[in-house]
Amino acid sequence: MKSRHILQWTVAMLLAVVTVLPAGAQYGNRGDKRYRDRYSRTNTYGDVVEIRLSEPGTLESKMPPEMVNKVRLLHIEGPMDSRDFKFLKKICDRSRCVDGRDKSVDNYIDVELERVRIMSAGSSGLFGSTGSHDVLDDALAYSSHLRSIVLPERLKRIGSNALHGCSQLEEVIMPPGVRSLGNDAFSGCHRLEFIVLPEGLQEIGQECFSGCEKLRNITIPRSVLEIGEKAFKGTALQHVTLPYGLTSLGSGAFDKTALIELDLPAATRIGDDYLGYMPKLQEIRVENGSRYYTYEDGVLYDNTGSALLLYPAGRNGVAVVPDGVETIGKYAFAGSAITAVDMPATVSTIGYRAFAESGIESVILPLSVTTVGESAFESCSRLQRAEMPGVKAMGKCAFKHCGSLKSFTTSPDITVIPQEAFEECKSLTSVKLPASVTTITMRAFKNCPAIADVEFPIGLTEIGKEAFEGCKALTAIDLPSALKSIGERAFKNCRGLSRVSLPEACKTLDKEAFRECTALAHVELGNVTSLGDNALRETAITVLVLPESVTHLGKKVAEKCKELTRIECHAVLPPTLDKESNSKIELRVPATSVSAYRSAKNWKNFKNILPLE
């Protein structure tokens, strides 16, 4: 019976190839206003074309060439494979057209594939070599003028990126048999506002509708079991009802939506316990019987109540964390409108981006808080003060981009100021670190232009890469005796810095460490052994004194130092020199080493090598 059916289908397809006539969608009431409007949109500058295929891979040969850029409504029947979709994509990605009045107009196209059967290229079976009936991955992605589409009636799965980036797509009509929507299937369809998900659908893939900015309403069928990460990110959803059987809700599924409230079914588990930033959210509730979550006063907690997972971002004023909470979860208050938070003495940990981009104005943590996670308060533009008396460990970027932050205090037990911890804190005027700090890591205070004073702890051993780069108000630094290394560009562009004295323990001055410190006129290098490329480039030094301990000089250590008149190198053996600069300047070396310098690589290029006086 099956082979007979195929034979009848093939014969029927051979009888008619191309017809110019109206066509209609079958998945709904054809009298519905949505459908009537859809067909009334065709106009005199385009036509309706119906094509019936007998073999896959023949769409291009059957399409009248003169219609490729004119067709407004294209109805296709019969078997199609990837070759046909490639040509169809070309039709849907055509350029704008010129109307009868010589004006450029949108060259939209509506496509009907209701009676299409999708095959793999070269397959002899109607459903492809895998036996499935899917819209291929990337099938019509970035079809810039596709306005609406009716999908094949036997469709089971819509592939990843199938209609991704179709910026003019307004409407999708899918058949009742669809069970799965692939990752990014409709993402970036900025004008999509109408779509009906069929009963029987079980899976909505990652970022499936991400960026569908006009999608305000959607009904999720009761059959859906899984919703992927960021599935509805950036949509205009204001209300959604999750099915009772939903077991998996991906991380950030509703990020940047307009949801005001949300009810979680008892069976649902949230990926990474993160629903996303919902700026209008006022309340979240959890169905009784959940093994994963509980809620109180519209706030989401884990099932024990010890971790606060989500505070509605639409609430303002002071947030009160109840007794018994031990952890503020990642993103818990991120982007919220709160101005302050009242924490109990039970809280010990603040998670990743817990308060990032919130409206908080001051932070006074209880002594019980020992850990502040990565980016915990990043980009809190109104934050002016932070007191962290018990914090022993702080994640990178903890206060990055807090442009109003004027002061902070930390625990006397903290040992590391982490990467980018206070970068771009433009109102910070002074830094006083506890004696326990041994390391200031890369970019910790980069581009803090108002910092005029830094009190370094006595036990500090390392200043990392770009740690104070761009701190233009810094005029003087007193480096502690324990300091061993200064990283790349650590003080670059500190234009107010006038004097630097390296301690005896400091052996490494990395490349560009003081580059563009245009007021730096006096440098004492202590017992340094290595100076990196451009370490003192574009400074105001007049005499560069290299200690006896130096063994290596990078490229152009003192390049473009306009006030430099003399270099004194006290090393008996010529240090390795990667590339000379200022070779016309007088070079003074130990009297017994003059001949050695005159024959040493790169040193020999100096024009005037004289003994030290």
Residue ranges and their predicted role:
Residues K2-V11:
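Bacterial N-terminal signal peptides that target proteins for export
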Residues L21-A25:
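Sec/Tat signal peptide C-region and signal peptidase I cleavage site
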Residues T10-V20:
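Bacterial N-terminal signal peptides
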Residues Y35-S61, P65, S95, T294:
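The feature captures the LRR N-terminal capping module
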